[in-house]
Amino acid sequence: MRGLEQIPWLYDALCALMERTGLGPWRRSLADGARGRTLDLGCGTGRGLALYDPAVRAIGLDPVFGSLVRARRRARRVPLVCASAEALPFRAGVFDTVVSSLVFCSVPDAARGLAEVKRVLRPDGRLRMLEHVRSQRRWKAAFQDRVQPLWTGVSGGCRPNRETERTVERAGFAIESHERRAQADLRLFSARPLR
């Protein structure tokens, strides 16, 4: 992985800007749906860790050690783990909720990462995701396809044209609810594992 995520202070500043320009309420809504033992998958610099209800027992996970150093400053009592989505270092069925915010666009093998999420979720658990996805507008999808190679290199692996909802369903989840923000092609949704 290369790109902005390798420069945690810059990544953090960009996230702060995005939260002030509209992403903040979406991230709060994502955290509000977390229950019990929760894995914050791709917690980055820890901006979302402070949003959880005190009753939630969160664990932050990110593949970039430098991001976790910054996350530690924000969430001193939250356990933090340096690992990738494709190889989660947890037993099967230990989480009530897995939260992922703008992560699966950058996971190299999204199908494998989602299989791992399904493995660590309890049978009645929930996956809560906020993702930007491939546009349903033909012209915008074509633009996403066009910029994808350059954007992926600059951004640390982000693929703006991924069909994330379809990938989630193929990984064995049923999407229960979702909100859309068409102008940004953002989706906030909750999914349950099919057994």
Task: Describe each PLM feature range.
Residues 86-98:
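A short acidic, Gly/Pro-enriched loop at the edge of an enzyme's catalytic core
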Residues 1-35, 47-48, 70, 144-151:
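Conserved class I S-adenosyl-L-methionine
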Residues 97-109:
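A short SAM/SAH-binding and catalytic strip from SAM-dependent methyltransferases
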Residues 111-123:
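A short glycine-rich, Lys/Arg-flanked "PGG" loop and its adjoining helix->strand segment in the class I
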Residues 5, 14-17, 130-182, 188:
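C-terminal alpha-helical "lid/dimerization" subdomain adjacent to the S-adenosyl-L-methionine
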Residues 188-195:
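C-terminal lobe and adjacent flexible extensions of AdoMet/dcAdoMet transferase-like proteins
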Residues 39-40, 44-87:
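Class I SAM-dependent methyltransferase SAM/SAH-binding core
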